[in-house]
Amino acid sequence: MNNFLVKVASTIEKFNMANKSERLLVCLSGGADSVTLLLCLYELGYDVCACHVNHHLRGEESDRDQHFCEKLCEKLGVELKVFHADVVGYCKEHSVSTEEGARKLRYDFFDSIGADKICTAHSLSDCLETAIFNLARGTGLKGICGIPPVRGNIIRPLINCTRQEIEGFLKERGQDFVTDSTNLTDDYTRNKICLLYTSDAAD
């Protein structure tokens, strides 16, 4: 078994995340992290299905991501459920930010599917970003701890994996993924902090 797969399998076992009798829902955006998560759980023999949320916030790019996920799941023979979210309308009605509204709609959709576990592709790199984000907001020690491996029925099998390891896994398999252009801008607070940190770390 590939070293990366061993690491993911060990994380699942260490935190008692899931067993082979459970139905696991992979939240699939088409990005490197979620594609890796789907492939890992599939190759490890878990009963997986996937879901994709088209937020319709990035024009053709949103549709590109959806089509990519559809083709990937078709190739693997994995069931995919697609949800079209009216983020703009929801945010206007409930007076919340785009990020907050999109997140609420996503998780409501995930819950509605009724899988045993919801699998998100948060990585060790995301934990670092979250800790920096929380520090910047002035939160205490709890905030610095970042993202928990398990929260209720939500599990994060890639939580001990770095972005470099994830991209290496995909490169080894010749597996493509999509890139969200908003991750390359500073339109959102989290992205802005991440870009600033990455820029500082590279100096």
Task: Give residue ranges: language-model regions.
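Conserved small/polar residues in nucleotide/adenosyl-binding loops
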Residues: 197-203
